Amino acid sequence: MARTQQQRREETVARLLQASIDTIIEVGYARASAAVITKRAGVSVGALFRHFETMGDFMAATAYEVLRRQLETFTKQVAEIPADRPALPAALTILRDITAGSTNAVLYELMVAARTDEKLKETLQNVLGQYSAKIHDAARALPGAESFPEETFPVIVALMTNVFDGAAIVRGVLPQPELEEQRIPMLTALLTAGL
């Protein structure tokens, strides 16, 4: 059966986004040019710009795809936490593992680049704002989340995400396994003590 134009478009965009993610993981954002990414995707540079008006739009779509995958993984894994297992340390472990993954490094690369690139910063702010709202909702659905006050819950979610993001960045340069193994028990104790 012949593919429709819409199917071909979706397949091309999916290949471009995967190539962008893989390229940034492998060589970093600074060397992830349109030519390098499109070569990896097996399409022309023109094809990229038929689907995305600017490189900033394409990088925002790349960030959105990374965040979509991470949210999907987080939500799926949280739903699989056994009822007899404490939800908080299990969810923190899932968050740690996601932020430590190579795909998350794409976000770090894009956020660092956005610090000095106003257009990229503007597009990422929108994508990250949407993601923050979705991660808040996913965290709110965790068993036991209702015990945290609504007014402080967004701060707690941001704090936990930032802790693991920061740890993932530092880990690449200065691994500290002795601290790593203590992080989740310490965070769990701090969070439950505040209830």
Swiss-Prot record:
This is Uncharacterized HTH-type transcriptional regulator Rv2912c. One of its GO terms (cellular component) is cytosol. The keyword Metal-binding does not apply. One of its GO terms (biological process) is regulation of DNA-templated transcription. Keywords: DNA-binding, Transcription, Transcription regulation. InterPro entries: DNA-bd_HTH_TetR-type_CS, Homeodomain-like_sf, HTH-type_TetR-like_transc_reg, HTH_TetR. Residues 10-70 form the HTH tetR-type domain. Gene3D superfamilies: Tetracycline Repressor, domain 2. It comes from the Bacteria. One of its GO terms (molecular function) is transcription cis-regulatory region binding. The keyword Ribosomal protein does not apply. Residues 33-52 bind DNA.
